[in-house]
Amino acid sequence: MATYDKNLFAKLENRTGYSQTNETEILNPYVNFNHYKNSQILADVLVAESIQMRGVECYYVPREYVSPDLIFGEDLKNKFTKAWKFAAYLNSFEGYEGAKSFFSNFGMQVQDEVTLSINPNLFKHQVNGKEPKEGDLIYFPMDNSLFEINWVEPYDPFYQLGQNAIRKITAGKFIYSGEEINPVLQKNEGINIPEFSELELNAVRNLNGIHDINIDQYAEVDQINSEAKEYVEPYVVVNNRGKSFESSPFDNDFMD
């Protein structure tokens, strides 16, 4: 250890001071910066208060797993049957993040992303007592958008006062793929929920059971079939399941 003049440091009446702390302690035992409970509680409450003052209302729709496949990491029977209203701070008020909307080889793609900040204790109080997980859904009624949580960042900011009072959620537009999605609004005791909040979830319930991304089911397919009638000849599907036929559907010109 580097040598120094101990007389440079102030000493208490019992002749102790920082000189002794420097020689015998890992951290200063008289200063509790990272583990002072009162400061941690104050910071946590201030974050929660700020979110409730400047935040937005969202709906949390957790994914329920019925029969998860541990090999492929998926559950073909997963469903969404419950929803809670909660407060979140919208980090990106300038607009959505991500690749946004663009045309690709597969048509128009919408890859909007949003970043939300929540206070974990406030979130657990308003929701189901648990923190959000990847794969759960967030409905943003202000823009009538449904997002799927991609990542929950627990370390930004990193341990202020020795505790994390913020969770940052990164979510992308949800792509419906046949799941049962019929959320019912849950009303925790003691939390004021407006009477008609349940109606806001109708937009989410309308996804349940659809097979096409268009409002009119199979509208694009029907249009293609209609335009193709002039050029496409009738055909028979050969898979041993269709109607029986006496001759081969392939004519001689095709076989040559």
From Swiss-Prot:
What does this chain do?
Plays a role in the association of the virion head and tail after packaging of viral DNA within the head. Together with gp14, forms a neck at the portal vertex of the head to be ready for the tail attachment.
Task: State the protein's name.
Answer: Neck protein gp14
Q: Which UniProt keywords apply?
A: Virion
Source organism, top-level taxon: Viruses
KW rRNA-binding (keyword) present:
no
Question: Which locations, inside or outside the cell, does it occupy?
Answer: Virion
Task: Quote the subunit structure annotation.
Answer: Gp13 and gp14 form a hetero-oligomer complex with a stoichiometry of 10:5.
Listed under GO cellular component are:
virion component
Recorded hits in InterPro entries, A to Z, give:
Phage_T4_Gp14_neck-protein
